[in-house]
């Protein structure tokens, strides 16, 4: 019996290679349709919100934008924000910005807020938020330079300017939270939702 029972693949409203890999590893067939939305504009119009609320809003807006053009399809949106105290970070624009961000996070504990939403025909069928707390070790500037040289521009694709699934793990001394939350896709609640609705084998 196949694990995926829905008539059509799940639509992923994201260009994230990591999210795609997580879902495909769980035997979820995908149609990938990255959402084209103005994330910063949406945040501005929403006014003052918490990091978790921002992630949830953007996950919904991504799914909603793609679902509008795909009637009847299950569309998954996902987003992640990083907060250090009251400061919320966005993806670094370049390696220089990534370096400054990692220097700011060095030796401190920050939070990753991940959110997912499934929308079909404009209706929100499922929403979930999760938080992970990560503490960076006090690494040297020379280590930071070597890390960025090895990791390259890939770090700018992540809100944290690191990839814990790769060499970014060397930046940390403690991690609290679900691995999939850190990757930006809380997988277990999503799988539970899909099973409860008969779209995955139970």
Placement of each model-derived feature along the sequence:
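N-terminal polybasic phosphate/anion-binding patch
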Residues: 1-74, 87, 142, 149, ...
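Residue-level signal for inorganic ion chemistry
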Residues: 23, 59, 79, 98, ...
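Mobile beta-alpha loop/short-helix "lid" or hinge segments that flank ligand
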Residues: 28-40, 117-123, 157-169
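Active-site-adjacent loop/tail segments of enzyme domains
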Residues: 80-110, 136-138
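Short beta-strand-to-turn element immediately C-terminal to the catalytic PLP-Schiff-base lysine
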Residues: 83, 117-119, 137, 174
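Anionic-ligand binding region
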Residues: 99-104, 114-134
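Active-site oxyanion/phosphate-handling segment shared across diverse enzymes
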Residues: 127-201
């Amino acid at each position: 019996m196949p694990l995926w029972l829905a008539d059509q693949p799940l639509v992923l409203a994201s260009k994230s290679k990591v999210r795609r890999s997580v879902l495909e590893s769980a035997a979820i067939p995908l149609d990938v349709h990255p959402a084209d939305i103005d994330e910063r504009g949406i945040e501005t119009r929403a006014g003052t919100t918490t990091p978790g609320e921002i992630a949830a809003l953007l996950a919904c807006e991504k799914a909603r934008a793609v679902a509008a053009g795909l009637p009847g399809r299950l569309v998954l949106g996902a987003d992640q924000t990083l907060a250090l105290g009251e400061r919320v970070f966005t993806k670094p624009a370049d390696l220089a910005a990534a370096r400054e961000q990692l220097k700011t996070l060095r030796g401190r504990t920050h939070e990753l807020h991940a959110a997912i939403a499934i929308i079909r025909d404009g209706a929100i069928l499922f929403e979930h938020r999760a938080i992970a707390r990560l503490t960076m070790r006090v690494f040297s500037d020379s280590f930071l330079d070597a890390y960025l040289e090895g990791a390259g521009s890939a770090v700018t694709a992540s809100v944290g300017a690191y990839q814990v699934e790769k060499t970014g793990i060397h930046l940390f001394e403690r991690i609290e939270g679900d691995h999939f939350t850190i990757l930006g896709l809380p997988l277990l609640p999503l799988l539970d939702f899909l099973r409860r609705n008969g779209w995955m084998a139970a």
